[in-house]
Amino acid sequence: MFSIGFIIIAVIIVVALLILFSFVPVGLWISALAAGVHVGIGTLVGMRLRRVSPRKVIAPLIKAHKAGLNLTTNQLESHYLAGGNVDRVVDANIAAQRADIDLPFERGAAIDLAGRDVLEAVQMSVNPKVIETPFIAGVAMNGIEVKAKARITVRANIARLVGGAGEETIIARVGEGIVSTIGSSEHHTEVLENPDNISKTVLSKGLDSGTAFEILSIDIADVDISKNIGADLQTEQALADKNIAQAKAEERRAMAVASEQEMKARVQEMRAKVVEAESEVPLAMAEALRSGNIGVKDYYNLKNIEADTGMRNAINKRTDQNDDESPQQ
């Protein structure tokens, strides 16, 4: 009986220990104690009940304690519950402390929750980043297109990481400054001879205002001559003027052809009227003879006049033809 009761008690104790070890991360608790971080078992159980992974909080807490940061489990747990990356924020605070950068945990947590990489921002504050722009084209006053590529050295401004503009804004502003500087040059050779004028002009405009970066320098990496935009525009304008002139000439030619056809139609109309009038002459003559208005002698005189007129016209036509043929011979 004694042995059976002892076995039952031992089984109960083992089951209780298994349940305890599965619910309470005893190994993590021992690691915290060994690192000098005092975390109660009740705190770990409370994290389990709040669906917080104790390792996600205690491991960064141990790291912060070893680095000399004064952080509490409540700070780390609240950031974890807000959806932040606790380990990255703690790493950023450690890096900021080593670099003598003022970065409270609350600011780092806010930067992390805003979607920024706070650790990368701290690293960029220590080691500035170089942003290379694509080729940016501008046209000088003499019409020559110049393309320039710039390298922008920036340092993260931790105070403006939340709400500050990103790299795209920096590139766009620098590109605008390059285009403006090239466009204000009277000759493209000025840009080739003094490319540093571009960087000086652009840097003096304070392009980093409202951004999450501080511009340290702008260096022109490459300058290329593209094409003569002014000549191309003049060529296109001349071609457009030529097309307009051709269109107007074609319009005038079409109007002239239409007018010619109209005149031909009128000539044919007049000829038809003449033929119609000539067809009425015999009838009028017959009526005049019948009524006695003219005599037979008058009629023959009229016929003689018509014959004489026809003969003269024939002679004139033949003379004109001979005059036209004589220069050709």
Curated annotation (Swiss-Prot):
InterPro entries cross-referenced by the UniProt entry: FloA (IPR022853)
Domain of life (superkingdom): Bacteria
GO cellular component: membrane raft; plasma membrane
Transmembrane spans: 4-24, 26-46
Pfam families cross-referenced by the UniProt entry: FloA
Keywords: Cell membrane, Membrane, Transmembrane, Transmembrane helix
KW Oxidoreductase (keyword) present: no
Subcellular location: Cell membrane; Membrane raft
Membrane topology: Multi-pass membrane protein
Function as written in the Swiss-Prot or TrEMBL entry: Found in functional membrane microdomains (FMM) that may be equivalent to eukaryotic membrane rafts. FMMs are highly dynamic and increase in number as cells age. Flotillins are thought to be important factors in membrane fluidity.
Family (UniProt): Belongs to the flotillin-like FloA family.
Subunit-structure text: Homooligomerizes.
Name used for this protein in its record: Flotillin-like protein FloA
Source organism: Staphylococcus epidermidis (strain ATCC 35984 / DSM 28319 / BCRC 17069 / CCUG 31568 / BM 3577 / RP62A)
